[in-house]
């Protein structure tokens, strides 16, 4: 099957035809390096890693250029640096924060089994390209200078009689709708509420560079111009695929399109726009205010979730088993289920080597808009048919190769009984809980769950149920002889 990908701009699945098959070019928005990456950040990293692998398979390992940027200039970085290193000059503190956070990010995504991108540019290394694009936009009448800022005018873009796309096309919004929905407290130097910043003056002590457009005061770039500059430098004026999370469609990606197309007078910045769906935690949007903000590092290195640290491959599996455009509800139960699948696969494979050729049906699944969930269903059939060499080849292709670590962490409710090839990796051969609880401790949790159910606090009830499940305790709700609700429990087998 030829590769077909869903394009956010056209809202349809289309045959993928690279501009230059000898150099397929993809850009994905990367992290702003001011704090540990959270599990929502992990999803696009993993999704586009699988796409990178597929493109390399289809077009050749040396014929794909994957660019994922590092944003190392941002207000959040400045705030973090000032808070963490109050005794240092701000620029030095910023350097410490960005270098440390970038290392942490790389450690985390390496643990998730992701390949490094071909190029990983930093925003601060591309200030010259940003100034060049801004000067072009001002000269073309698409941007203007006001109060030492440079601002882009979507109205000017839409008024241009040229090949340019309509501002708002990617997000499927009209300019009138955006103006009506703009906040009341619009900066006084803006001509229109929808105008956005390309460049702004720096405050004393902040990072600063010589400004474009004849501005004498030094300043720093806005967020959106950074990606336009880095993609242009490494991929050209127009390239094949631009990816990121669905939350970036507007305003970030919409503004990237505006900047790049107006600067280079093209009708498209990228031939295909791809966006992965939202991630929720236990049914709610993840946020620090709700107390459900989970970092990749917490899952990999602490026992906060499920009573033990998690292997990166397990998180990877939980992220890809759902189609990339669908939302994900992250739960400890989902990690347990993914762990059980990988554990079963690795256990059955034993010391079998991978097949030399990937099954065609497996590649066909992935070529259908990166349908990894369908590919996983096919992998289950390989296990059922005892085609373990083919199963291992498909696992390796999707980034799963750490059998020892996966097998060393026993899934909830599973007896350890491994073939000799992996016996040394196992933690034991007895049926015990991952984190043993006393009978009274279990019953205390069940009583707390019963009380939560009585007051209709089902979120808390489900949380306790999932916590017990993660510890190997299966609970069952029923009624006693008098018809009253009762909950029983047993150690899962």
Swiss-Prot record:
InterPro entries reported in the protein's UniProt record: Cys-tRNA-ligase, Cys-tRNA/MSH_ligase, CysS_C, Rossmann-like_a/b/a_fold, tRNA-synt_1_cat_dom, tRNAsynth_Ia_anticodon-bd
One term under GO cellular component: cytosol
Binding site for ATP: 288
Localization: Cytoplasm
Motif 'HIGH' region, residue range(s) on this chain: 31-41
Cofactor note as given: Binds 1 zinc ion per subunit.
Keyword Aminoacyl-tRNA synthetase part of the UniProt annotation: yes
Keyword set includes Glycoprotein: no
Cofactor: Zn(2+)
Complexes and interactors: Monomer.
Protein name as catalogued: Cysteine--tRNA ligase
């Amino acid at each position: 099957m030829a590769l077909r990908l869903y394009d956010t701009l056209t809202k349809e699945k289309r045959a993928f035809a690279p501009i230059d098959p000898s150099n397929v070019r993809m850009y994905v928005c990367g992290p702003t390096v001011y704090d540990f990456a959270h599990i929502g950040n992990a999803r696009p990293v993993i999704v586009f890693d699988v796409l990178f692998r597929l493109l390399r398979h289809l077009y050749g390992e040396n014929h794909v250029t994957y660019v994922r940027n590092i944003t190392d200039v941002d207000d959040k970085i400045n705030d973090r640096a000032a808070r963490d290193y109050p005794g240092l000059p701000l620029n030095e503190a910023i350097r410490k924060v960005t270098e440390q956070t970038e290392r942490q990010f790389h450690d985390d995504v390496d643990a998730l089994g992701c390949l490094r991108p071909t190029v990983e540019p930093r925003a601060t290394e591309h200030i010259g390209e940003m100034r060049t694009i801004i000067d072009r936009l001002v000269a073309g009448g698409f941007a203007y200078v006001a109060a030492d800022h440079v601002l882009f005018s979507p109205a000017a873009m839409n008024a241009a009689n040229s090949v340019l796309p309509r501002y708002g096309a990617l997000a499927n919004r009209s300019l009138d709708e955006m103006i009506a929905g703009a906040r009341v407290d619009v900066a006084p130097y803006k001509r229109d509420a929808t105008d956005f910043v390309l460049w702004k003056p720096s405050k004393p002590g902040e990072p600063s560079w010589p400004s474009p457009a004849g501005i004498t005061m030094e300043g720093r770039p806005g967020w959106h111009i950074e990606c336009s500059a880095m993609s242009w430098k490494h991929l050209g004026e127009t390239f094949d695929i631009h990816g990121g999370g669905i939350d970036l469609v507007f305003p970030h990606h919409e503004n990237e399109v505006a900047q790049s197309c107006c600067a280079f007078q093209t009708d498209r910045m990228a031939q295909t726009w791809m966006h992965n769906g939202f991630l929720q935690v236990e049914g709610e949007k993840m946020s620090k205010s709700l107390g459900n903000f989970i970092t990749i590092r917490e899952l990999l290195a602490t026992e906060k979730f499920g009573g033990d640290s998690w292997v990166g491959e397990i998180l990877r599996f939980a992220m890809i088993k759902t189609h990339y455009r669908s939302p994900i509800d992250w739960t400890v139960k989902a990690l347990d289920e993914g762990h059980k699948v990988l554990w079963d696969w690795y256990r059955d494979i034993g010391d079998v080597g991978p097949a030399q050729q990937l099954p065609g049906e497996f590649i066909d699944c992935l070529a259908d808009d990166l349908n990894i969930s369908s590919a996983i269903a096919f992998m289950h059939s390989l296990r059922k048919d005892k085609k373990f060499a083919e199963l291992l080849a498909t696992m390796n292709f999707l980034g799963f190769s750490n059998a020892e670590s996966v097998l060393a962490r026993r899934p909830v409710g599973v007896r350890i009984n491994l073939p000799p090839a992996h016996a040394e990796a196992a933690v034991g051969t007895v049926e015990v809980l991952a984190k043993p609880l006393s009978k009274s401790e279990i019953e205390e949790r069940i009583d707390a769950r019963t009380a939560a159910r009585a007051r209709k606090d089902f979120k808390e009830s489900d949380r306790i149920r999932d916590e017990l499940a993660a510890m190997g305790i299966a609970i069952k709700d029923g009624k006693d002889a008098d018809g009253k609700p009762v909950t029983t429990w047993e150690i899962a087998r």
